[in-house]
Amino acid sequence: MKRMSAARPARWTRRHLDLLVDAAATTAPVIDPAAMPRILPDHDLWDLWPVQEEDGSTCVIGGQELWMALSAPILGHPEERHDRARIRLLAKDGDSWTDLGHAFADGASPGSREWSGSAIRRPDDTVSVFYTAAGRRGEAPPTFRQRVVEARPALVADGRRILLDPGAEHRELLRSDGHMYLPAEELTGAPGRIRAFRDPGWFRDPADGRDYLLIAASVAEDDRFGGAIALAGTRDGAWSLLPPLVVAEGINHELERPHIIVHGSRYHLFFSTQRHTFHPADFAPTGLYGFVAPSLTGPYEPLNGSGLVLANPRAEPDQAYAWLVLPDLHVVSFANYRSSPGGDLRSAQADQARAGFGGTVAPILKLTLNGTATSVVPAEGRRTSP
């Protein structure tokens, strides 16, 4: 496809992080554990996203919204859930969630795990599910090869039961080119310490009506802290990689779950990252970060000067993660780890970590956007329902 004219990638630097301050406008309230009902009693849920219509709204079937999330059986240490991750289909009616089972049939994915993505209902009642295939089908132990895959199953409504046709083909769309973006093909690794080429977020640019994917990626920097947000575009069904929109200049390893919301004719680019992936670790909080630009390709500038949009509170620095901003500016996430006297639960014994892990939908928040300034405001009347 013909390359878009693009501004140079925005560089997220130490200078920006030096502007970061504790402020109520960018701090989430402490989560009450009672406000986090477990949707699936035997499975962890994390990394939620709605099935969208092509206009960006959430798909509604028979009065129920369709959502997806990553899921894994509640076994062992919560960090091991990534080695068993499958995409789950969910229906939501108000504050009530219904489990619709795995989105795909066993063995349908080319990977050994299914990691985060996005989903769009098409006019022909199929659903384009863009997701990350991690590893290779049938492998043991799991590896960390990552590529972007599309499945396009038919949406089948049978009474109040909603299904995706299990016979859909899973087609690899993109993998890192090894030039603009580093290969994400490690055989061994762990969350927060591997290269990225994952989390495809679908976006239709109102300026040209074309479809794009935003991808969490890695670029070559002087050290390993070269997280980036890749852009890919399609023409006549063929996808190709474009230059990155944002590059972390030696300050962060992972810019995860990138997505764009157009608000007030401005392009708001959001992503999530964790405190332990900064350089040095804990230099900045786990949170939702973002940039804003007049067009898809920039030029981008960090929101609130630093890029920080929404941080976990100091008292609970890991309480939630994987924030996703919806078109109405409500923000969904999942409940991660509560604070523990024993320190970081990611490295704790399995039983201690399990006792402090949420593994379900976190309370809903809402943003206001005003130029380069943002603020967290109460999502009135909403608990776990965007």
Pin down the residues of each PLM region.
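Carbohydrate-active catalytic/glycan-binding domains of CAZyme proteins
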Residues: 1-386
